[in-house]
From Swiss-Prot:
Gene: argS
Name assigned to this protein: Arginine--tRNA ligase
HAMAP family hit by this protein: Arg_tRNA_synth
Annotated organism of origin: Streptococcus pneumoniae serotype 2 (strain D39 / NCTC 7466)
Similarity section: Belongs to the class-I aminoacyl-tRNA synthetase family.
Entry's localization field: Cytoplasm
Amino acid sequence: MNTKELIASELSSIIDSLDQEAILKLLETPKNSEMGDIAFPAFSLAKVERKAPQMIAAELAEKMNSQAFEKVVATGPYVNFFLDKSAISAQVLQAVTTEKEHYADQNIGKQENVVIDMSSPNIAKPFSIGHLRSTVIGDSLSHIFQKIGYQTVKVNHLGDWGKQFGMLIVAYKKWGDEEAVKAHPIDELLKLYVRINAEAENDPSLDEEAREWFRKLENGDEEALALWQWFRDESLVEFNRLYNELKVEFDSYNGEAFYNDKMDAVVDILSEKGLLLESEGAQVVNLEKYGIEHPALIKKSDGATLYITRDLAAALYRKNEYQFAKSIYVVGQEQSAHFKQLKAVLQEMGYDWSDDITHVPFGLVTKEGKKLSTRKGNVILLEPTVAEAVSRAKVQIEAKNPELENKDQVAHAVGVGAIKFYDLKTDRTNGYDFDLEAMVSFEGETGPYVQYAYARIQSILRKADFKPETAGNYSLNDTESWEIIKLIQDFPRIINRAADNFEPSIIAKFAISLAQSFNKYYAHTRILDESPERDSRLALSYATAVVLKEALRLLGVEAPEKM
């Protein structure tokens, strides 16, 4: 139980008109610490109690009695709580030194499954910075949900089907070079894809030719299937190399093609339930009662099924296969209307588990304010970007610590971590402008800044040869250490907020605050000096390191022991 929960619990025992949850929402942190650590505004009780808020505050303060509080005073309409810093710091340090990396573990999920649809790049196209967002947000959410007691299933729903394969086959047959593709598959396939899109703008017959080849592919034409399989296999080799760089793993690579033989069953169910309507030769599901103006287009007039039909088949397959408690789609916010339709159609089909489906949208990555586009060849490719980030990190590490033994390994952890952290510290629904120099900086609100704070603490602990005692009598009451204690105590609540909002940035911002607070503490306090507080200061340093490393792990970022 954290401090706010304790106060809410104490107050709920003497306030009849508000429950603990309602009180918790009303608690505030005073701007001036001289006014206490936490405040409860009595305004909300004035109408029910028919008394002035000042009088209510005075009565509540008088009734409060807990050893966790140094004092409780009424100041005007507020009840101000001054916490017992020594008692709370002892409790927090005891918890972290005992539980270590399992501090803040919870069992909210009771081992139920959370399916996370994430990354999902298109076959035969390069893995760009645009795909990075879905990959790192999904990976972080997987760690967060595991931390609170869920099992996760990470699904890479590959874009391995569609008219673009018709375009690619036409381009390859016209201009492709087998040896060049074998040597650099994605580079060569991207050149072909960009070229055919440019030429198709002036030559509409290329579009028709591509449609014809895609029809052949759908009908199982041997040549078309062989080329498609080749493009897919070569792309996956490259993707997996990048996923290894990012240290991201998947439980399933079932992409769009996997559901080719599962869509007719969806159409049959919709038909049996009388949900399909005829509209200009196409078959649709009307969703007006859900406030959705456009009907869901299930089958075109030429009999071709659509993207939503495939996603319906995927949703049914995943529910049947994994019996999920939550199914999360980490997909750009431009797809919001699609996912509203998906949920509404499942609801129409009578599946109440449609409520367990959540679209987790995210904003765009731009470069110098401009939108990125594979088709126009305006794209930031991840592989050279990672290499550049690692190189920049290494330059800074060599300047800071020329004697460091495993520079390459540390530079990789810092460079990759910098890119991930910068993405994840951004509120998910906001976009950001890609700036590698800012990402890899050791100053400011960056991954390397947090990693360096962790490495600095490890250096302090090595110098002191500090090993925490699980029964250690650690306690502090100074202002600088109190700021750190409050943050560490809040870590379980931070994780819950991140899970509830599908928002890793909450954890990234927490990690920045904790690193900043420790650096401030380090500047003010001689941690290694002989004093009665030395062991407690070292225990605080140790606890900070444990929580920083765990916060970074939840973001999929490594924490090097030395930098």
